[in-house]
A protein has these predicted regions:
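Catalytic-loop of the protein kinase fold
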Residues: 32-39
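Protein kinase catalytic-loop region centered on the HRD/HxD motif
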Residues: 24-32
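Conserved protein kinase catalytic/activation segment
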Residues: 41-55
């Protein structure tokens, strides 16, 4: 699982993350929006000749003719709120889409922050809703 590899010293986690950014870019270039890039839904297999990525929850995909940059960056919203992880993905993704690093980093960081805020708000609302019963 992707998040398990982030702390695995047997593999180069930075390189693993860069390769993941390339994998996501290839999906986006082909108009594939995987709606749940949460760490548990991305499986990583380390092979002698590189990495293989597999997606879980394939029913959470959308196929589009084209994906705007805004849509692509929002697609990373479920990544863990780990600045180092977001920075590495942003560096690689920026080079692949030929955009400034700051633009990509801010877009992904904003998307992950907004998602976390919505997630926490929903969690709190559920808590208070249960207390009313």
């Amino acid at each position: 699982v992707f998040h398990q590899h982030m702390g695995d010293r047997r593999i180069d986690a930075d390189f693993d993350t860069q390769v993941f950014a390339g994998f996501a870019h290839r999906l986006h270039e082909n108009g594939i929006e995987f709606k749940d890039f949460s760490p548990g839904n991305v499986l990583v297999v380390v092979r002698e000749n590189g990495y293989e990525f597999y997606l879980v929850d394939l029913n959470r995909m959308a196929f589009r003719e084209e994906m705007s940059l805004e849509k692509r960056l929002k697609n990373f919203e479920r990544l863990p709120p780990d600045e180092r992880l977001i920075r590495i993905i942003s560096e690689e993704y920026a080079s692949l889409v030929r955009k400034p690093f700051d633009e990509i980093y801010e877009g992904i960081a904003d998307a992950t922050r907004a998602f976390r805020m919505k997630f926490e708000l929903r969690r709190k609302m559920k808590f208070w809703k249960r207390r009313k019963k």
